[in-house]
């Protein structure tokens, strides 16, 4: 090994030797102090990945600028050689091994750039199972949830005991019919998977005799399985066992009563509930509210003003005319009777002519003298009137007074 190293060193120039030694030596020691592992994946500025072998010699991929091939003893290219020569003695590799095996914390955490690559060496990642966090209120491992909700077949596979043919034939969707090798002496009655709402029954493996395929004793997985079930399955199973004649078809309440309790320990049951569903009160108020048609309202107002009020005026004017003609009165009395009822209907007084309202009868008499006997003038005056609905009361009062 030493002969091979010296031969390769003689073939290199002196300036290349010093440059590469300065790059590889202190940089690798600094990286070792930071990461705490044996050989980090990146050592020099050229970023050549290094891997730790069991022999303790650093090896790596082929260098981009190294002119030599890999040696027969596993030593790679010239950067690895300079890194080995920069160490003070041959016992330095063992010193680094002791540094890696020590359980003390590293001097400094690795930089953020190397967090994923330096988290675990490849040797330990191969033989170790993937990391799973412990169960807590926030994080529930997926394997535990599968064991508890996947039916009896998953639980038998997790326990690792029993007949493999039995474990393969039991499917969570099919009814559970445990085949007992000793005969039909088992007190357990098979129940379908729907009776326990997708979860494993607490009666399986929790009795004193155990499952029928395990005649040696109770299931070793039952205590661990029982922790995740609700309080209903922790009760004595002798009282919870249904009778042999009762089936889920004959007694449909069986599956509901033997299901999981609706409590906080089983949050998956609450998914079917309608929680905090908002009531739609806006739509109800919208349907009860009457719709307003403003065009129709204006149309009816016009019709009522032009038709209804005119009919009332025509009737009242006809009665006035008949009474006036039939009664023996002089012309002055006739003019005096007609004037108060028709005087507000004559012309509409403007803001500059208030004398018509203030003067009273003497000014209204000449205007009404010619049109007193013509009912058509009264109708035309009624259309122009300011108060078309209040004139009836005034007419009756004047008639009674005179």
Swiss-Prot record:
Protein name stated in the entry: Protein FAM53A
Keyword DNA-binding assigned: no
Motif Nuclear localization signal mapped to chain: 273-281
Main localization of the protein described in the UniProt heading: nucleus
GO cellular component: nucleus
Cellular localization per UniProt: Nucleus
Function: May play an important role in neural development; the dorsomedial roof of the third ventricle.
Keyword Nucleus: yes
Alphabetized UniProt keyword annotations: Nucleus, Phosphoprotein
Biased composition (Low complexity): 336-345
């Amino acid at each position: 090994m030493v002969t091979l190293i010296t031969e390769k060193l003689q073939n290199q120039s002196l300036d290349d030797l010093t440059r590469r030694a300065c790059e590889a030596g202190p940089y690798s020691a600094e990286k070792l102090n930071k990461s705490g592992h044996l050989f980090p994946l990146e050592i020099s500025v050229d970023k050549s990945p290094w891997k730790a072998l069991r022999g303790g010699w650093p090896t790596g991929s082929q260098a981009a600028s190294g002119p030599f091939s890999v040696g027969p003893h596993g030593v790679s290219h010239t950067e690895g050689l300079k890194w080995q020569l920069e160490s003070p003695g041959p016992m330095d590799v063992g010193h680094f091994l002791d540094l890696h095996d020590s359980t003390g914390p590293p001097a400094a955490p690795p930089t953020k750039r190397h967090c994923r690559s330096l988290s675990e060496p490849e040797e330990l990642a191969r033989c170790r199972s993937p990391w799973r966090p412990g169960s807590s209120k926030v994080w529930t491992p997926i394997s535990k949830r599968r064991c508890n909700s996947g039916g009896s077949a998953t639980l038998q596979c997790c326990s690792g005991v029993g007949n493999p043919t039995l474990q393969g034939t039991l499917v969570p969707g099919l009814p559970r019919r445990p085949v007992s090798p000793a005969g039909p002496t088992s007190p357990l009655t098979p129940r379908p998977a729907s009776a326990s709402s997708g979860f494993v029954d607490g009666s399986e493996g929790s009795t004193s005799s155990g499952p029928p395929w395990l005649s040696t004793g109770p299931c070793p997985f039952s205590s661990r399985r029982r922790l995740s079930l609700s309080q209903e399955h922790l009760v004595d199973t002798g009282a919870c066992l249904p009778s042999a004649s009762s089936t889920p078809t004959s007694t449909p309440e069986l599956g509901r009563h033997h299901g999981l309790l609706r409590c906080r320990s089983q949050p998956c049951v609450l998914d079917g509930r309608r929680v905090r569903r908002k009531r739609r009160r806006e739509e109800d108020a919208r349907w009860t509210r009457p719709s307003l048609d403003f065009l129709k309202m204006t149309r009816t107002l016009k019709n009522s003003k032009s038709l209804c009020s005119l009919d009332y005026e025509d009737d009242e004017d006809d009665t006035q005319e008949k009474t006036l003609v039939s009664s023996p009165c002089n012309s002055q009395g006739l003019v005096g009777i007609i004037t108060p009822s028709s005087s507000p209907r004559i012309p509409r007084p403007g803001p500059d002519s208030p004398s018509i309202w203030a003067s009273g009868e003497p000014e209204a008499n000449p205007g009404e003298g010619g049109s007193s006997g013509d009912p058509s003038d009264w109708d035309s005056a009624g259309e122009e009137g300011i108060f078309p609905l209040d004139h009836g009361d005034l007419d009756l009062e004047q008639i009674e007074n005179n």
